[in-house]
UniProtKB/Swiss-Prot annotation:
Entries under InterPro entries matching the protein: AAA+_ATPase, FlhF, FlhF__GTPase_dom, P-loop_NTPase, SRP54_GTPase_dom
Name the UniProt record assigns to this protein: Flagellar biosynthesis protein FlhF
Compositional bias per record (Low complexity), positions renumbered to this chain: 67-83
Pfam families, per database record: SRP54
Record keyword Transcription present: no
GO cellular component entries: plasma membrane
Keywords from the named record: Bacterial flagellum biogenesis, Bacterial flagellum protein export, Cell membrane, GTP-binding, Membrane, Nucleotide-binding, Protein transport, Transport
Example of a GO biological process term: SRP-dependent cotranslational protein targeting to membrane
Species annotation: Campylobacter jejuni subsp. jejuni serotype O:2 (strain ATCC 700819 / NCTC 11168)
Amino acid sequence: MGQLIHTFTVEDTEQIIPKVKEDYGDKALIITNKQIRPKTLNRSALYEVMVAIEESDYEEHLKKQGKSLPAKKSSPKPSSTSLAEEKIRSQIPQEDEDVVLDFSNTRLNTNLNTVKNNDLAKKTYQDFPQNKINPHQNKTLGFDDFKEKLSEVSNEISKVTNTPLENYTPNPNYNKKIENFEKQFEKQINKLNDKIDLLADMMWDDKAEARKNLMIPPEFASIYKQAKESGMLENHLEAIMKATIENMPAAMKTNKDAVQRYFHSLLRNILPCRVESDIKKQKIMMLVGPTGVGKTTTLAKLAFRYAYGDKRYKTGIITLDTYRIGAVEQLFQYAKMMKLPIIDSIEPKDLDEAIKSLNNCEVILVDTIGNSQYDQSKLAKTKEFLMHSNAEIDVNLVVSANTKHEDLMEIYKNFSFLNIDTLIITKFDETKVFGNIFSLVYETNIPLSFFSIGQEVPDDLEVANSDFLVHCILEGFNKGKNNE
């Protein structure tokens, strides 16, 4: 009885052992396995496996499965595109073919897994020696011939199998096929995009009446949709789109990317932001606004920014809020943690005294009581504090980004008698639309000073930036992305 050598292919290395056990039994020996086809977008990888088994063991395994030993036949001429694979396949039978090796007079005591690794990194498939295998040799070998041939073949196969990927020389025809496929795929995608654009233009023209006779070219459809979904007022959007269409150079109007850039630029110019400059004389900032917009938390963030930022100004705090015990205690706790002086002023006449006691501070932050924009008595009390002070006080109206436009305008109108200098917008992380903020600034023309973008003290505070706000208006707020 002789020894048989079989080859077969699988698409996954995890299939090798189960297939060997199923087809050849537990006594089969895996000589080697190698990848003969890399994985691509539309095809799985392919691995070739060589196994050896005694003919008697193979017959016994087949009997258990109710099968008989296949007839011996010569292997067909291979059609592999790799020179090394052609030579190996001329010696190694194809899938499900048997080779009988004559060991009748001699014992074989060798390890079929022996691998030599000399010059491993230098070997490619094309380096396989042509004199290693005689494609016309009879498949029945004597022991000496078999030992020599099998040793050489195993060595070369092992070198090919273990060749590093970076040293592998792919078949040029295969690369050309992939390149042609990519070109065809790109053409199909471009055709599909053209069809989508055509359909979008047709739908855009059909809906012209719904835009109140606002003649907007299809190239402006995307930016129009973004702006409309942001929540800005319809009349504001109409005015901006008209300005864009009328003033934009004709050569740019057919380019969607150019339209996007121009529209972004126009919005940035509409949104005034106060430039943060070095403090050369004492700066007093009073924060006013309705209940629940985050004035106290924002003041704590500002205190840390001025006291421990790049410039490190001497900073003090005054609170006029004696109604909300919890808020006052919270502010005192913040001041204690930051080691900043803090004074509470109960009566309007006491404000100037409090400011004088913090005369050594370069920045003084004043917290006020939060109240409804409709509570005229408390609003009048805040106005009284300002009237009794001779100091130059910068009044900052704090409003929340998640407040609808109608309420924002009510808040501004009822606080405007305090002579608002800037707007501070809070709670960026609690809304997805910012067109309401745009419309507020568009109507009031009050500059923006700071954005509170989250609840973390002191980190979630940004100096107002029109580019940042425009990005939020058109694309939404993403804390990890917008403030990079």
